[in-house]
Amino acid sequence: MAEKNNETIIVNGFAFSDETEAQQAKKEQEGIAYISGKLDMNHPQMVLEIYNKMVEEALFETIIGEMYLKELRDYLVTIPYLNQEEILPVPVIHRQA
């Protein structure tokens, strides 16, 4: 969901001052909704594989995507039978101000 508020654009509760980044965040939010609809959280190994693939492919560029990856990672680290070393860290993209 995106809304314009003076000079900022709100996407999923985050205020973006850059319109290009806001549009990217909106695309990522739509992608997240699609992925979430397909992802079966009852199969952690599958979640891990998809999570790692998203990280390796640098699928997300905005805080919206980073937060989604963080949520998935937080879930994965709670699964005792997963090898914690296989769970990649969430990459943080440096943004130009």
Kindly give the residue locations of the regions a language model identified.
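Intrinsically disordered, low-complexity linkers and terminal regions
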Residues: M1-A97
